[in-house]
Swiss-Prot record:
<keyword id="KW-0732">Signal</keyword>
<dbReference type="Pfam" id="PF00049">
    <property type="entry name" value="Insulin"/>
</dbReference>
<dbReference type="GO" id="GO:0005576">
    <property type="term" value="C:extracellular region"/>
</dbReference>
<feature type="propeptide">
    <location>
        <begin position="68"/>
        <end position="87"/>
    </location>
</feature>
<dbReference type="InterPro" id="IPR022353">
    <property type="entry name" value="Insulin_CS"/>
</dbReference>
<keyword id="KW-0873">Pyrrolidone carboxylic acid</keyword>
<comment type="similarity">
    <text>Belongs to the insulin family.</text>
</comment>
<keyword id="KW-0527">Neuropeptide</keyword>
<keyword id="KW-0165">Cleavage on pair of basic residues</keyword>
<dbReference type="GO" id="GO:0005179">
    <property type="term" value="F:hormone activity"/>
</dbReference>
<dbReference type="InterPro" id="IPR036438">
    <property type="entry name" value="Insulin-like_sf"/>
</dbReference>
<dbReference type="GO" id="GO:0007218">
    <property type="term" value="P:neuropeptide signaling pathway"/>
</dbReference>
<keyword id="KW-0964">Secreted</keyword>
<feature type="propeptide">
    <location>
        <begin position="20"/>
        <end position="44"/>
    </location>
</feature>
<protein>
    <recommendedName>
        <fullName>Insulin-related peptide 1</fullName>
    </recommendedName>
</protein>
<feature type="modified residue" description="Arginine amide">
    <location>
        <position position="64"/>
    </location>
</feature>
<dbReference type="InterPro" id="IPR022352">
    <property type="entry name" value="Insulin_family"/>
</dbReference>
């Protein structure tokens, strides 16, 4: 009985690990919704305005030449952990 419980525990650990590491393609509206949910905890409403804070838009001016979430998650699959690095 104990060996069965150890097997179940090990199987559960591996299942959780591989579930976290699964990758998907996120493009367009799916990408923006995923970032909104991951970064802000909920999908923003249309009337709430642009989801980037007013002081944050200047930080995006120097992004040219760097890989962004579209490069990382739309052109190739990425994990939730990779998506969260863009929060």
């Amino acid at each position: 009985m104990k060996s069965f419980m150890v097997f179940v525990l090990i199987f559960a650990c591996f299942s959780c690990y591989y579930a976290q590491e699964s990758t998907n393609f996120y493009c367009g509206r799916t990408l923006s919704r995923a970032l909104a949910v991951l970064c802000y905890g909920a999908e923003s409403k249309r009337d709430a305005g642009w989801w980037i804070p007013q002081h944050g838009h200047h930080a995006l001016a120097g992004v040219r030449g760097k890989r962004g979430p579209v490069d990382e998650c739309c052109e190739k699959a990425c994990s939730i952990q990779e998506l969260m690095t863009y929060c």
